[in-house]
UniProtKB/Swiss-Prot annotation:
Organism annotation: Syntrophus aciditrophicus (strain SB)
Cofactor-binding details, from the entry: A monovalent cation. Ammonium or potassium.
Gene coding for it: coaX
Stated name of the protein: Type III pantothenate kinase
Record's catalysed reaction(s): (R)-pantothenate + ATP = (R)-4'-phosphopantothenate + ADP + H(+)
Residues involved in substrate binding: Y100, G107, A108, D109, R110, T184
Keyword tags: ATP-binding, Coenzyme A biosynthesis, Cytoplasm, Kinase, Metal-binding, Nucleotide-binding, Potassium, Transferase
Length: 254
């Protein structure tokens, strides 16, 4: 079995593939203060509850945008699984040309998403990934990574509102019925959800104008399901796009 690990700034997503089939996946918090043994035991217990033996994990690949986490997860893989993980980074085979001024600057998760979307859908696409930051990445009809843009994520944008405006409460991410709201909580929810949907639609529209075509627009990431219904541009959600991309990249390097 193949263990894929996608380390984001806020959450870490793990998945186990048996061949091409994703048989289990989990989402845990990214905590750089945790020790090797704390992460090792957490992962061990996740597998145990899913009735997966640690000995069944024969291969591991990691995509990480939080460099200190590699100092934790690499030893975890070697100590608890006796496997040296493959790390997505410079020099790894992606099978995708990267048209970026400095390819080393591109976040591993962005490349992984691009690889997955082209392999899976076989067409040009814009991938919108709702994470700590929200990324917009364009893949050409020839399967080339052409770049994109990065916006503040919906969570950190909202945190700025809660922390900088002392009289405004924290609110849950849910969509109010009306944009012209009648109370403070609903007003904030309207601003956050509809405002962010407008940000997404605006950026996608400008990207399409610059590209001069009409690519598939696909969303992934933890909050995609909250924002997508309020957008006009996102056509579909693929929750497991990043995990699938990691599987593909591992295959191309094995």
């Amino acid at each position: 079995m193949l263990l894929v690990i996608d380390v984001g700034n806020t959450n870490t997503v793990l998945g186990v593939f048996d061949g091409e089939e994703l048989v289990h996946d989990w989402r845990i918090r990214t905590v750089i203060e945790n020790t090797v043994d704390e992460y090792g035991m957490l992962m061990y217990n996740l597998y145990k509850t899913s009735k997966i033996s640690s000995k069944a994990i024969q291969h591991i690949i990691i995509s990480c945008v939080v460099p200190p986490m590699l100092n934790i997860l690499e030893p975890v893989c070697e100590k608890y699984f006796q496997v040296k993980p493959l790390i997505v980074g410079p020099g790894i085979k992606t099978g995708m040309p990267i048209f970026y001024d400095n390819p080393k600057e591109v976040g591993a998760d962005r490349i992984v998403n691009a690889v997955a979307v082209f392999e899976k859908y076989k067409r040009e696409a814009i991938v919108v990934d709702f994470g700590t930051a929200t990324t917009f990445d364009y893949v050409s009809p020839r399967g080339e990574y052409m770049g994109g843009c990065i916006a503040p994520g919906i969570v950190i944008s909202s945190e700025a509102l809660f922390t900088r405006a002392s009289k405004l409460p924290r609110v849950e991410f849910s969509t109010p019925k009306l944009i012209i709201a009648k109370d403070t909580v609903s007003s904030m929810q309207a601003g956050i959800i509809y405002g962010y949907a407008g940000l997404v639609d605006g950026i996608v529209a400008r990207m399409k104008e610059e590209i001069g075509s009409n690519p598939l627009v696909i969303a992934t990431g933890g909050l995609a399901k909250v924002v997508k219904p309020e957008t006009r541009s996102i056509e579909m959600i693929d929750d497991m796009l990043t995990l699938e991309g990691l599987r593909l990249i591992y295959k191309r390097n094995s």
